[in-house]
Amino acid sequence: MIETSEVRVDLGDHGVLGIPYVTVVGEAGAGPHLTVIAGVHGAEYASIAAARDLLAELRRRPAELSGTVTVAPVVNLPAFWARTPFVVPLDGKNLNRSFPGDAAGSAAERIAHAVTERLIKGSDYVIDLHAGDLPEALEPFVFYDASPVEQQARELALAYGLGHMVRQSSDGRTVTGSTSAAAADLGIPSFTAESGECGILARDAVDRHLRGLRNVLRRLRLLPGAAVAFEPPVEHDGWIWMRTADAGWWQPAVATGTLVAEGDLLGTVSPIVGGAPTRVTAPAAGVPLFITSSPAVCADGLLLGLARPVNTI
């Protein structure tokens, strides 16, 4: 059975938003319910394309599927139509900092609440697909949250086969209000997968997501065949999100995916006209997994995410 439906969100003065999703119920027998979400950030096109491609594949092969897969390719439709990075343009809030949401809150909080209630709850597993947004260079990685179900989340994240994997502690989460954190708090194994950068619809980034999705489906026995054991990733114990105190012109000095030592130069932030640049150095050894690729940075603007490795690169 293939069913198309909508998550209906009352946005108050902004009307009612309908977020489309499709549920494919397999014909090969019983199995778990996996939900795949994408487009939490509306300009991360590689991840959205991967969700669409996965859905097209599942539509063609329900007879091979054991269990249920729900796919929501674009949950942040206001950002998608407006081509807006990072936030819901109706309120300027980051949807992936708004979960589990609030039915009486702002637009982002209402969308997050509806997605939590209609898509996350009731799932056995959740995968949230992302990519580097419009001004964001990115090294492919997965991350999951510390929780009572983290071992299951870790096993699925490993099956996704990306080169870096971050475990985020539940004590002082760097990323709060995310889909995967909300799922973990509900006891649902979940992880976030990142592939693609700068809002570019690159085929290799899409295929990297699809390779991981297919392997997780086999790992969960939703699809026939043995899951592939990929080369172990570089594992990271949390990360440091580095920001600039002042607005200015950001010039990175490192590339994503490269190991840096404590004290290494990561980049500089300079005044638009004249003045000495401010050096940005690594507070600890780590690997930049994403870097703001735009030279324009606001005060308190995010520069990069430095992940702390716990095994050898």
Language-model segments: which ranges?
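Structured catalytic-domain cores with a bias toward divalent-metal coordination
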Residues: 1-313
